């Protein structure tokens, strides 16, 4: 099965400038941070992405209806940010590297069609230190994002970033997007709501900065 995009609804309002992705990972930090944008704003499900392993990760509704796990793409507006954003959420990460690439490419193709300019992926940053205070790290794809991130107090990170967060951010540069990957410090507690809230807040500030630039 190839990756497949199911269009649910078209966008009738202002086109989004920024796309955000959050999938399950360390401390569930990324998905919960991205979910805050959807739950706290006015969100509309516009598309669903299916990959091969969607059929083996099933969801059963309260009425007993079984359906494959899809990756949902939301169009979100809010008084908290200047322009609408696109948010990708999913209930799992494929353990197959090829499928992870397919998901990333499909999402980025969709973002390209919608003329998105910035793509930010979210995740957790494993730390063993006592977390009296938390840092949020960024690996930016462009100079503008780097400059704005430093102003927002984000720390620069280096090294290997695994999973969907690293893959989507890494590929997005080759699709011509600005942005990068943001990672909040966590000790791996599930869920780490403190890390997710901090990550959400830092990205919100950054989104408003890039929207105004």
Model feature map: region roles:
Residues 34-39, 104-106, 197-200:
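Short, solvent-exposed amphipathic alpha-helical segments in soluble enzyme
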Residues 86-88, 118-120, 178-183:
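Hydrophobic/aromatic beta-strand patches that form the interior of the parallel beta-sheet core
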């Amino acid at each position: 099965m190839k990756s497949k995009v199911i269009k649910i609804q078209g966008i009738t309002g202002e086109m989004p400038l920024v796309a955000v992705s959050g999938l399950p990972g360390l401390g569930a930090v990324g998905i919960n941070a991205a979910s805050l944008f959807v739950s706290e704003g006015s969100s509309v499900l516009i598309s669903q992405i299916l990959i091969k392993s969607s059929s083996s990760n099933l969801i059963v509704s309260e009425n007993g209806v079984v359906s494959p796990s899809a990756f949902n793409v939301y169009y979100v507006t809010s008084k908290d940010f200047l322009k609408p954003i696109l948010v990708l959420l999913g209930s799992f990460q494929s353990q197959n590297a090829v499928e992870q690439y397919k998901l990333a490419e499909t999402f980025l193709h969709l973002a390209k069609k919608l003329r998105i300019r910035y793509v930010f992926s979210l995740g957790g940053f494993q730390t063993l230190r006592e977390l009296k205070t938390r840092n949020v790290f960024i690996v930016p794809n462009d100079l503008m994002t780097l400059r704005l991130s430093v102003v927002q107090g984000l720390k620069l990170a280096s090294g290997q970033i695994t999973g969907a967060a690293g893959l989507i951010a890494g590929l997005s540069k080759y699709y011509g997007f600005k942005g990068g990957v943001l990672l909040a410090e966590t000790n791996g507690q599930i869920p780490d709501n403190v890390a997710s809230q901090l990550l959400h807040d830092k990205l919100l500030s950054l989104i408003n900065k890039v929207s105004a630039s």
